[in-house]
From Swiss-Prot:
Statement: the UniProt record of this protein carries the keyword Signal: yes
Upper taxonomic lineage: Bacteria, Pseudomonadati, Pseudomonadota, Gammaproteobacteria, Pasteurellales
Family from the record: Belongs to the thioredoxin family. DsbD subfamily.
One Pfam family named in its UniProt record: DsbD_TM
Location in or out of the cell: Cell inner membrane
Database matches in CDD domains: DsbDgamma
Broad class of where this protein is predominantly found: membrane
PANTHER family linked to this entry: THIOL:DISULFIDE INTERCHANGE PROTEIN DSBD
Protein name in the entry: Thiol:disulfide interchange protein DsbD
Catalytic activity: [protein]-dithiol + NAD(+) = [protein]-disulfide + NADH + H(+); [protein]-dithiol + NADP(+) = [protein]-disulfide + NADPH + H(+)
Disulfide cysteine pairs (residue numbers): 124-129, 193-315, 495-498
């Protein structure tokens, strides 16, 4: 019995030992369990957002992750939020790998539901390496994510929030914030896009045959501002709904030339060459309300205000961008319309006050009124120069201003008497005419030196931007960025504030010093090409100027976007926060 017991004990011990040997055989997870993959689309369909959940002890090779649209040769580059780690791999040597979950994006245009994206990746674990894994995804089958990964950024920049974002957030959190836009409009009244509206309003109120009383002057100014506010509001909503192509269409050379001709005709009428008026039959019906569609008529004031809204609308500012951003994101057209209206109304109030008080301090009606009217005719001629400067080379802008100033000073000198103080003013006016005519002399007689000619054709800022033509070139350039951040300037020839950036901000020595640590990129949006449209849709650009900043992972830095003009000091401080 003892021998039998010993026999069975030895048998079970042997099986137990063998069982332990089998237990030492290592088991590995299936590839979908080791690297659980999922993908979604961004709301604007410009990003395919990929996510991998990596099991403990496993890792993905960074350089083995790739993607492309099936049937198209261009690969899609991956931008990840997480930094890869260095790893000594027994198969590939020292490589960069991901050992935890990955959130990344493939940028492109994913509007066609039938398109397919092929994503390939490969990973390993200790003692075992998986073959490359390929996923083929149909665009139409992907869910849409409500969050864009591109908006995330590194920790040091989370405190940044651009002014337009703060304003848009304010509208989301409190509808009472719309009244703050009226105050912001007061400040915008003194920007280069709105100030040219002052002479037009002054010409309407003051430049008429008889000096208006205070009530009539207020009514004219008020109607002018209402016309401007109405146009500004409607165009703002159109830009928010349609996008930058609508804004660019308003800046087409045909539109600029047409408006310029209109202002020239109005200016000539102020010189008394002719009178613009409605047919007699219609005048009798409308009576005094629209007896003359020249300066001083209520209908003319409102119409000129609407035209002024066209002139001012292309200039993008932070308050305007904030309102447009709110409309685009919320779809709340009513709040957006009220916000834009109050912004435009704030812009018009200072113009009204300046015009009203200017009208009040003038002496009573007399012969001087004709001189004042003709003076405002010259002022109105400045508006075509302002408009044409958006589409003409910079050298022609200076020639047009020189010609207008020269003619004005000669005319003004001829108005002065030959006695006493008037004679002194006459001499000074002729002297000023001789100074202002110099650019025209240089042009006609070709007396410019080689240096002057070179300066005319050289960008004012002398900052060297790498020109970008499309999204693919942008992605490649960002991937090769040797600096900590990259800056993308969206520019157009018709954009007045863009030229201000070039002349006043980018030329600043402090800003240029900071630019040495930044990859400088620029896209010319003047022609609104298909490539321009793709960039505009990808980054949800509301207007120009717009400047974007990207981090080392080639993602746009949240809250860093600049829209509207920013002076050198403010821009330098802004960059300092990013570096």
């Amino acid at each position: 019995m003892k021998k039998l017991f010993l026999f069975f004990t030895l048998i079970f011990t042997a099986f137990a030992a063998n069982s332990g040997l089998f237990d030492k055989k290592q088991t590995f997870l299936k590839v979908d369990d080791a690297f659980a993959f999922s993908a979604t689309l961004s709301t604007d369909k410009s990003q395919l957002q990929a996510h991998w959940d990596i099991a403990d002890g496993y890792y993905l090779y960074q350089d083995k992750i790739s993607a492309e649209l099936v049937g198209k040769s261009n690969p899609l580059s991956l931008h990840t939020q997480q930094a890869a780690e260095l790893h000594q791999d027994p198969y590939f040597g020292e490589v960069k790998v991901f050992t935890h979950s990955i959130d990344g994006i493939f940028r492109g245009t994913f509007n066609n539901a039938d398109d397919k994206v092929e994503i390939t990746y490969q990973g390993c674990t200790e003692g075992f390496c998986y073959p490359p894994e390929t996923k083929v995804l149909r665009i139409g089958d992907l869910a849409v994510s409500q969050e864009q990964i591109v908006e995330k950024t590194v920790e040091k920049n989370t405190a940044l929030l651009s002014e337009q974002d703060r304003l848009a957030d304010g509208l989301f959190h409190s509808k009472w914030a719309i009244f703050g836009f009226f105050v912001l409009g007061l400040g915008l009244a003194f920007t280069p896009c709105v100030l040219p509206m002052l002479p037009l309003l002054s010409a309407i109120v003051i430049g008429q045959q008889q000096r208006p009383n205070m009530m009539r002057a207020f009514s004219l100014a008020f109607l002018y501002v209402q016309g401007m506010a109405l146009t500004y509001t409607l165009l703002g909503l159109a830009v928010a709904a349609i996008g930058l192509p609508f804004q660019i269409a308003l800046q087409h050379p045909y539109v600029m030339i047409g408006l310029s001709i209109l202002f020239v005709v109005l200016a000539l009428s102020m010189f008394g060459l002719f009178t613009i008026q409605l047919p007699n039959s219609l005048q009798n019906k409308l009576n005094t309300w629209s007896q003359k569609q020249t300066s001083g008529a209520f209908g003319g004031a409102f119409a000129m205000g609407m035209i002024a809204g066209l002139v001012a609308s292309p200039c993008t500012s932070a308050p305007l961008s904030g309102a447009l951003l709110y409309v685009a994101q919320s779809g709340d057209l009513f709040t957006g319309a009220v916000t834009l209206y109050l912004l435009a109304l704030g812009m018009g109030v200072p113009l009204m006050l300046i015009t009203l008080f200017g009208n009040k301090i003038l002496p009573k009606s007399g012969e001087w009124m004709n001189t004042v009217k003709q003076t405002f005719g010259f002022v109105m001629l400045a508006l075509p120069v302002f408009l044409l400067s958006r589409i003409l080379p910079e050298v022609w802008e200076s020639r047009l201003w020189a010609g207008l100033a020269t003619v004005f000073f000669i005319w003004f000198a001829l108005q002065m008497s030959k006695n006493g103080f008037g004679y002194a003013i006459k001499i000074i006016s002729f002297a000023l005419a001789m100074v202002t005519v110099q650019p025209l002399q240089n042009w006609i007689w070709q007396t410019q030196t080689t240096t002057q000619s070179a300066v005319e054709n050289m960008p004012v800022s002398q900052v060297k931007f790498k020109q970008i033509k499309n999204t693919e070139e942008l992605d490649r350039t960002l991937a090769e960025n040797p600096h900590s951040i990259a800056m993308l300037d969206l520019y157009a020839d018709w954009c007045v504030a863009c030229k201000e950036f070039e002349k006043l901000t980018f030329s600043d020595p402090q800003v240029q010093q900071q630019f040495q640590n930044i990859l400088l990129l620029q896209v010319n949006m003047t022609k609104n090409s298909p490539e321009n449209k793709a960039l505009m849709e990808r980054f949800n650009v509301m207007g120009l100027p717009t400047i974007l900043f990207f981090d080392q992972q080639n993602n746009e830095i949240k809250g860093s976007r600049v829209t509207g003009f920013m002076d050198a000091d403010a821009f330098s401080n802004w960059i300092e926060k990013l570096l």
